[in-house]
Amino acid sequence: MDKLHKNEIAGMGTVIWPYYMVFKERLILKKFEDVKIVHGTHADFKQTVRADIEKNGLLCPMVIDEKDQLRNGNHRFKVLKKQGDASFFYKANSREEVNFFSRLNVLCWELHPDMSQLMEKLWQGKNKKYAEKVPHIFTENVKIAKPKQ
């Protein structure tokens, strides 16, 4: 697991950092022990995910909902909790946001290592229907200039 970016943070332990943290306003650093698992895993796919993490590191944040239930990244979670104590998660506040962040993670994984077309691809094809349902995510904490009068 040499490709994992991790360091020690006081009060958190060993933190595993994703490479691509696109929507920083939605990131939350959580200890693995504070995240609730709601879905099972499949041994074969877990091995595929483990091999990808060994090759590339952790590419994307996992996704939790407003109740800190893991909604995307179960296989990554199972692999990573043996490598550290905490990581960054996207915090989704609705089903639409869970779907969007989950699709974003798939897209990041597909585009890696060339992320130059990420924003363009988010608004194309099957990704567009997810992005259109959560336009507020793209403007959170963005300063909006007042129009000149």
Task: List each language-model region with its residue ranges.
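Alpha-helical interaction elements
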Residues: 112-149
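A broadly used, surface-exposed interaction patch
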Residues: 95-97
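Short, charged/polar connector segments at secondary-structure boundaries
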Residues: 1-92, 101-115, 123
